[in-house]
Amino acid sequence: DIYGSGMSETVFGDAFASDPSLHREDVLIQSKCGIRQGCYDLSKEHILESVDGILKRLQTDYLDLLLLHRPDALVEPEEVAAAFDVLFESGKVRHFGVSNHKPMQIALLQKYVRQPLVVNQVQFSIPVSNLVANGMEVNMETPGSVDHDGSLLDYCRLHDITLQAWSPFQMPSWKGCFLGSDEYPELNQKIRVLAEKYGVSDTTIAAAWILRHPANMQLVTGTASEKRLKEIIAACNITLTREEWYELYLAAVSYTHLRAHETAANL
């Protein structure tokens, strides 16, 4: 409910309502709540008010999935549970999840919430890959060995929580898209080779890298280009080999580690 101050949902709702060929039961609609100007807010009152606003803007009676956008340091799990009960029993929300939450934060919520938390949406791309790096670089003195997120990937797989990857084409530190960027020449060269091999675009290969992971992740991305959307969808039909997956990972992580060492040396 913060994107464009809700305008994104208004535009989507208007577009959906204007096309009689679209049927609500054929579309899965997901939204988030929990951020207000200047603070995070997972209180019962804010969650309920947010969902009512979301439904009004989307011109629909229910959400298929509601996510708690970010952890609220002042969260009272009992309030979240009470809000979820109201939303579920009223039919306004069918499924629930979180975004950018660590395992213990999820476990704390799930202790009180009766409905299963089925999604955790986190940042993940080839260059932003700590989600998998800390699992491979165990007992190493490398940047990737630092577990910032408490074995998040393993926890979600153990508890049947679907991971959604946001900003799947993003570089670290919000520097923009890595595809075609001079920041990652080796990675982009290897992506182009694979794109030619499979007869697809660079975008398709970058998306296929995420989908190749056995956690069965989902991509969360936005575009104003129908062509690019089709390129992303095409990734569902590409299965990179194990060697190709690691080749792309190493091309990105070697650059990221180099930057980290340079930064540390300059401190």
Say what each PLM segment does.
Residues 1-11, 36-41, 72-76, 103-104, ...:
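Acidic-and-aromatic substrate-binding clefts and catalytic sites of carbohydrate-active enzymes
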Residues 1-27, 89, 172:
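N-terminal binding-site loop/beta-alpha segment at the start of enzyme catalytic domains
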Residues 25-37, 122-126:
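A short, structured active-site edge motif that brings together acidic residues
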Residues 43-57:
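Short, acidic/polar
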Residues 256-263:
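Conserved small/polar residues in nucleotide/adenosyl-binding loops
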